[in-house]
Amino acid sequence: MSFIEKVRKLRGAAATMPRRLAIAAVGASLLSGVAVAAGGSPVAGAFSKPGLPVEYLEVPSPSMGRNIKVQFQGGGPHAVYLLDGLRAQDDYNGWDINTPAFEEFYQSGLSVIMPVGGQSSFYSNWYQPSSGNGQNYTYKWETFLTQEMPLWMQSNKQVSPAGNAAVGLSMSGGSALILAAYYPQQFPYAASLSGFLNPSEGWWPTLIGLAMNDSGGYNANSMWGPSTDPAWKRNDPMVQIPRLVANNTRIWVYCGNGTPSDLGGDNVPAKFLEGLTLRTNEQFQNNYAAAGGRNGVFNFPANGTHSWPYWNQQLMAMKPDMQQVLLSGNTTAAPAQPAQPAQPAQPAQPAT
């Protein structure tokens, strides 16, 4: 059955569902199609020229009880953390598979860090191993990215644990902003590209849960509990705008409108999902301005679909801005203590 036929079949079934659930179901189906359309062959340095000083590191994560693969290109004491999408692979980071990011940042004065893995994780600290797919450990990506890996990188690769940038796309767009909200010294710069910036709102928890289940059988209840759990708002960039404003974080927010340009992405899922995501990005800009935010770049062009060429274009567009912020020496954000993830009164129960 073709993708379009699947969508038509789902739309027919959705006609009997409540409206919010129907939208979520169709959206989740389209989201899974985007992942396929935006995929690529897992080849090292896929679109970067050969001979670059890219290293493949094994960084210990005591919180997850395993080593995490990290692709790394040294370039200076400050680094760009490039976070992957929903279907992150266990062999290479999507930025390496689908873009020439290593080549683009070679001799830029910035190191490049690409953590590998984390499918459907939202780079968050989960409550428990995912129920239903046999996961035998608990995702603790926030701990890894903000404590374990920075200390290891400082000791072994001379990368500072402060004054870095977090750049995320799709699933990880909001994650980048959340990392900056709670860890302002580490991330004075954060960028979201086509990110889901209000995950606790309305039908978004349902949509996210369906998409996670489709991508590896992951259970959103195991991540942040039911949609009423405070962890959803704790990890919601829209809710955490006051932190970003108080920190004076330099933010870069991009979302297309679902119309393809000469960069490509002219397929139903890529167009639909970008259009679906745009509303919350525009609302984020409005709320940010209303909260007194004055340190953001917002790009909502008259084109752009949910696909890698547009995200790479934005990465290159923000590069000079990122260099100016991170290499100027003025990377000290407002002092703030990292807030701990909300804890439930008792372990969240698996969804039924």
UniProtKB/Swiss-Prot annotation:
Which UniProt key words apply to this protein? Acyltransferase, Secreted, Signal, Transferase
Its annotated compartments are: Secreted
Q: Where does the signal peptide begin and end? A: 1-37
Stretches with biased composition (Low complexity): 333-352
Q: Does the keyword Transcription apply?
A: no
Q: Which domain of life is it from?
A: Bacteria
Enzyme Commission code: 2.3.1.122, 2.3.1.20
- Please give one Gene Ontology molecular function term for this protein: trehalose O-mycolyltransferase activity
Identify the catalytic residues.
Answer: 170 (nucleophile), 274, 306
List the catalysed reactions.
an acyl-CoA + a 1,2-diacyl-sn-glycerol = a triacyl-sn-glycerol + CoA; 2 alpha,alpha'-trehalose 6-mycolate = alpha,alpha'-trehalose 6,6'-bismycolate + alpha,alpha-trehalose
Q: Where is this region: Disordered?
A: 332-352
Chief location bin = secreted
Q: Where is this region: Fibronectin-binding?
A: 102-112
What is any one of the record's Gene Ontology cellular component terms?
A: extracellular region
- Cross-referenced InterPro entries: AB_hydrolase_fold, Esterase-like, Mycobacterial_A85_antigen
Pfam families from the UniProt entry: Esterase
**Record-annotated residues binding substrate?**
86-87, 170, 198, 276-279, 306-308
On subunit structure and binding partners, the annotation says: Homodimer.
Instruction: Name the family the entry cites.
Output: Belongs to the mycobacterial A85 antigen family.
PANTHER family in alphabetical order: DIACYLGLYCEROL ACYLTRANSFERASE_MYCOLYLTRANSFERASE AG85A, ENTEROCHELIN ESTERASE-RELATED
Question: What is this protein for, i.e. what is its function?
Answer: The antigen 85 proteins (FbpA, FbpB, FbpC) are responsible for the high affinity of mycobacteria to fibronectin, a large adhesive glycoprotein, which facilitates the attachment of M.tuberculosis to murine alveolar macrophages (AMs). They also help to maintain the integrity of the cell wall by catalyzing the transfer of mycolic acids to cell wall arabinogalactan and through the synthesis of alpha,alpha-trehalose dimycolate (TDM, cord factor).
Q: Name it.
A: Diacylglycerol acyltransferase/mycolyltransferase Ag85C
- Natural source organism: Mycobacterium avium
Q: Which gene encodes it?
A: fbpC
